[in-house]
Amino acid sequence: MAAGEPGDLGVYSFRFLPQKTFQSLSTPQTTSRLRQWSMLGRIEAQAFGFDQTFQAYRKDDFVTAFFKDPNVIPNLKLLSESSGEWLTLGTEVKKIEAINVPCTQLSMSFFNRLYDEAIVRDNGYIVKCLDSFCDPFLISDELRKVLLVEDSEKYEVFSQPEREEFLFCLFKHLCLGGALCQYEDVINPYLETTKLIYKDLVSVRKNPQTKKIQITSSIFKVTAYDSVGVCYPSTKSHEQTFSYFIVDPIKRHVHVLYHCYGMGEVS
């Protein structure tokens, strides 16, 4: 059914939820780490509410309505490529792309294979390797190699479906960081920060029948276009420039996780 039809399949409308804060991005420890990874001041999470039953198969209608909503346009934040200042959308979105991002992982044991495959030592130190480049990233350890180099020996430690998982994407984004990223020697800061942000953004509930915890969020990686071309998350494409929409169909909230690649705050 198309957007605009009556009942629960009507046009979505949204409201900004400025009172919703994301502690995972603002703790002193996370702030320090994001500064080291050149992401501080360039990563943002925002929350919006919506008023209709969310239907995953109508994701394109949902995202299109989001970008056209009068409560979204003056509040959705993005970074200016030219000035580096935070702006709001300020342009009419003509087209959107919303890619489904699987989200099934409930445990950080997903990353235990990094130890099993000697990418990380038992003491948590990341195994070093000879420097190489996978433009624009410097690869100086086995972790970045397994994240980026498709023909590397251990790339298949994670299957393609596993690499598409939101937990993996979040971990990879933090590991690669911004333009002046200072890489960690040990794995724990990446794992801890990934876990904090993941738990902050993703909704779960206990299944009343099975009593098992299950993820209720639907996640999309979103791009928007105006009459000129890509306008969101940025006019310039980069692997580390992204916007994820994390939709909670029960609370009727959408969390927007945004990052624009560049030089993060240093002080």
Swiss-Prot record:
This protein's record includes keyword Coiled coil: no
Q: Which Pfam families does the UniProt entry name for this protein? A: CFAP300
Keyword DNA-binding assigned: no
Compartment list: Cytoplasm; Cytoplasm, Cytoskeleton, Cilium axoneme
Domain of life, per the record?
Eukaryota
GO-annotated cellular components: cytoplasm; cytoskeleton; motile cilium
Instruction: Identify the keywords attached in UniProt to this record, alphabetized.
Output: Cell projection, Cytoplasm, Cytoskeleton
Query: Which PANTHER family does the record associate with it?
Result: CILIA- AND FLAGELLA-ASSOCIATED PROTEIN 300
Family membership noted in the UniProt record: Belongs to the CFAP300 family.
Q: What is the protein's quaternary organization?
A: Interacts with DNAAF2.
Q: What does this protein do?
A: Cilium- and flagellum-specific protein that plays a role in axonemal structure organization and motility. May play a role in outer and inner dynein arm assembly.
- Any idea what this protein is called? Cilia- and flagella-associated protein 300
Task: Report the source organism.
Answer: Bos taurus (Bovine)
